[in-house]
Amino acid sequence: MMEDNVPGFIGYHITRDGKLYSRRIERSPYKFGKWHKLRLSKKARVKVKLYKDGRGYNLSISRLVALVYVYNPNPSKFKEVMHLDNNPLNNNYKNLQWGTHSMNIQQMIFEQRRR
């Protein structure tokens, strides 16, 4: 059985490559838990809806993976998750890094110039 590892949400486990599992909680129709179907937002970001205290929260898979598996050297400064290959569908922890908004924009411009 997988341990809960998503901060602030009981019953959820995120893998290093961005797959989300929820274990069975009372009143749930799933006997043993389930792997969640991920969806794409209008901006081509992979999202999922997690529930806490009966309320749903739409969260980015990249943020969840980064919160659990990617070290943030300065949480008060680095609040944005950057995709190192600029592919928002690649949510493997090795492709994610914490940074500032300006760092993220600079990286995107640099990558576009290289192509």
Describe these PLM feature segments.
Residues 1-80, 85-115:
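Conserved recognition-core residues within compact binding domains
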